[in-house]
Amino acid sequence: MKIERINDWFARQGRWMVQKRWLVLSLFILVFAIGFTGLRYFKVSASWENYFLEDDPMLVKTKEFKDIFGNDNFAAVLTQCDNSFMKENLELIRELTNEMMDSISYADKITSLTDIEFMVGNEEGMTIEQIVPDLIPTDAASLETIRRKAYMKPHIAERLVSKDGTLSWIILKLRTFPKDSVWNKGKNAVSPEVLTGNELEHIITKDKYQKLHPKGTGLPYVTAMKMKWIGKEMPRVMGIAALVSILILLLITRSLRGVVVPLITAAGSIVIVYGLLGYVGMTIDSGMMMIPMLLAFAVSIAYNIHIFSYFKRQFLLHGERRRAVEETVGEMGWPVLFSALTTFAALLSFLAIPMQPMRFIGIATSSCVMLAFFIAITLMPVLLSFGKNGKPHPKVQETGGRWLDHQLGRLGESVLRHGTLILWIAGLLTAALIYQFTKIETAFDIERTMGRKIAYVNNLLEVGESELGSIYTYDVMIDLPEDGLTKSPAMLVRLDSLAQKAEGYKLTKRTTTVLNILKDLNQTLHEGDAAYYRIPTNPEEVAQLLLLYENAGGSEAEYWIDYDYRRLRLMVEISSFDSGEVERELNDIAANAARLFPEASVTTVGSIPQFTVMMQYVAR
């Protein structure tokens, strides 16, 4: 009796909708217009930091790091030519270096073959000069002198130019990006991360630099290229989804209304939900934007097919259009609502994951499902109510249904007869699938998740596989208990041990610390003797070296040691991303840092730790 009362209630609503069909259509158009207007406030982000909630420990640690050392992101370019030490190539590398520094909005400090702090000893101690002079010579002897100078210090050369001289590496440090509240204004706001990547792409694609075959890298560049690719791919994917939907609807409904209304339902639910999210100021991750759209298409087709099929059956039985609409809403309202509610509840489970994109999926997909239901149960019946009555179909009237109705009925009877067997088969399949489910690996590796057929992914992977280039980085910040401790040779030796440990990892391309400067300076002051490429043995000597470096105009050290001489930074560049290996290496470097510096606070930050934490949130 209870289900009959529910069906009666839905039937009354169906009767009311038919009577007030123009009002129902007007309300739908009004709500659609409100949602469409809200799309102007719709903001798409590709920042990895936006994956985390505001109070997430990872964001707190990252903010602390940036307050001390600045931006942990970088933008870089790998160049490739026959000989980097030819005059025209050196001029192009210098021009590219200067343009990156001048034209990228958040540029801070750049290092390249033509712009580097190259320390040379003199009578006063040492001076900082360039490997490549301001006026690049044309004669072979002078160019060979530049080559010899570039390779004079192997620890410098391995960061700038390949052994055969065909590759060069340009790396740009970036100023700290402002908070979202600073830039996220207006309808065409672009995040600093994407802006930086777009500016780099604009520079390296200029015709004048193509002789260098420049390839960009760095997280801002990866993010911008991802946004650009999604912007091109999304219309194609949605177009394919719409085409497949139309073909399915044509095959099943064979009716114009049966094709158009589900598409309106899908588009309406997407526009209204995304518009409302725009009004409330929710930022949407570019990689997740299509998921609610595709789900909206799927449920819109399913719900409307149920409604249309039942209407068509009833209409063929007695030919009374409005009566068929009322019967359809009465009989299909509760089953479709129940289906929508279960899907809605399941999708809300995404809200339990402490990540912004997952919560967006939970909110957007569940909202699209419920809106698709409301639009389907109102718009489809209302539009079906327009038109003349028809004559009952003799065969349908005689048999009580169409051929497919009878076949599905027989299938149901067969299921009931073989219930035990079906349960056993379902149980075995479920057990097998649960076992296979344990083999699923959560990964952010662009090669495995996107593939080399995508041009920008292939370029990035080639950069990582090259002798010089890297794609991602992570940082280890060591916060010692007292100011001045970072001048202690004992602490610096521990830092050196940690860097050497990191260099032994499978994924590490290179490491950078303040020791690169101190060791180089110590060697320079001892007439370039390679035996002195080491850490000084007493604190006073360390302090004198740092003072001499600053007086000579050096500024690189401030990125690796703080002004209070309390905190040290180790940056590790990696060439590729292997989820399991990265997590193992991060855990190992953190454990070794804690062992070497038991009295210090050790923090790992950067894109790689963020990816790892995200995988843990999703998978565990």
Task: Describe the function of each predicted region.
Residues 1-28, 326, 374-430:
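Interfacial helix-loop-helix hairpins and adjacent transmembrane helices
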Residues 26, 279, 300-309, 333-352, ...:
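Transmembrane alpha-helices and their membrane-interface boundaries in multi-pass membrane transporters
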Residues 39-85, 90, 140, 144-161, ...:
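Solvent-exposed, non-transmembrane loop/terminal regulatory segments of multi-pass membrane proteins
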Residues 49-53, 255-265, 280-296, 350-368, ...:
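Membrane-water interface of transmembrane alpha-helices in multipass transporters/channels
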Residues 67, 137-255, 493, 544-620:
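Extracytoplasmic
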Residues 231-284, 352-356:
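Interfacial segments of transmembrane alpha-helices in multi-pass membrane proteins
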Residues 314-341:
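Helix-loop junctions and hydrophobic alpha-helical segments within the transmembrane domains
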Residues 410, 414, 418-539:
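Juxtamembrane segments of multi-pass membrane proteins
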